[in-house]
Amino acid sequence: MPKRRELRTLWNTNGIFANSGYSIEMRDILYRLVEDGWPVAISAFSGLDGGPTDIAYPSQLNPRFKNLIIKHYPRMGEPYGSDGMYFHGRDFKANAVFSMQDIWTLDPSFLSKIPVFIPWLPIDKEPIPINVVQKLMFAYKIMCFSKFGYDLLAENGFASTFITEGTDVEIFKPQNQAEARKKLGLPQNVFLFLMVGANKENPPRKGYQEAIEAFKMFHDKYPESAMLFHIQQRAPTMFPVKEYVNYLGLGGNVFYLDDYRSMFNSTSDTIATEYNACDVLLHPSQTEGFGLCAIEAQACGKPVIVQRCQSMPELIIEGKTGFAAETLYKRFTSDLSFVNVASPKSVYECMEKAYALVKENPNKVEYDCRQWIINNFNIDTLVKEKWLPFLSQLQIDLLGPDGASLG
């Protein structure tokens, strides 16, 4: 008996080629839905201008999805896609419009016109910012991708569906470290920490200053250590990573992926090489609705240092696949919530623990990290066991058991 795949969905998010965490997660979910027969399209408020275009799955990644295409609609006038959700949704004849983004950016004048708006959103602050709560009022259903977010939504009276983010473990997997370092032009005889993330603001949300200060403490004790940054550097609003590294006297021990390559020529396969070149990923963000890099790195067999707040502790097994640094203080922000600033001393102490863990038994660390991700964050399992049942039930709710619309 053929599977029923009548539900049409539009997803407001980054284009799948945009090299962001959102674009990677959407790529991994939506092409699997296309493979399963679901009609989907993307309203790409980031990554596409001009007109609609069909975009194929990247040919150098998972060969299983070669030649599958997804229609991408371009950004219209509103910077975060509120107008596109409405107008592109009508053009695609979408039964439901999803978003994967920070919904505080969305315009309620468009949300109010969308009958079935379903945000799959990050909750990355406590309390939930009021501008997020206001937009949730327009949702037909609410979805979140962390247990932290699910619990906080419940405390605020919102029922939600929790489906965690996941990663493609056929792309992110262990490789030979020496070959990865050779490919990236990195020294072989160092204990290497890596940071991967956006550098959009100052103070930096990804915790760059705290991580650099922690690395200074670590490097003073272990001069054979080094650090690699995959970020973008050049803008007045960004945190001056290189300058701060030089200020602390670490310039000869810190390496950077080329800025242009970081922005435009980095895809999941090249980032997997970076994870495999390192020994430990540093990810002590000030706010985090999930933290995709943390599970990608562990899928490659690398332990991760996070901060003990928001979603981040959910992503590791403390003492086995990573460590959680403590918060130094919370900073009150204009959205009437808090960001958490990690203690550099605590990050350093976690670096010491991770160093000892890797040095003692690197093969066990690699195995433990990878199995944790395969068992809990494998995107194939999540699509099969979470997304397909959710969409099948939504299809019945909206179209009826026989395909006739209930609206």
Q: Model-derived features: where do they sit?
A:
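A charged, aromatic-enriched C-terminal amphipathic alpha-helix characteristic of glycosyltransferases
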Residues: V341-S346, K359-L391
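Short hydrophobic beta-strand element within catalytic cores of glycosyltransferases
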Residues: P303-V306, I316, F323-A324
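C-terminal alpha-helical cap of glycosyltransferases
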Residues: K353, I379-G407
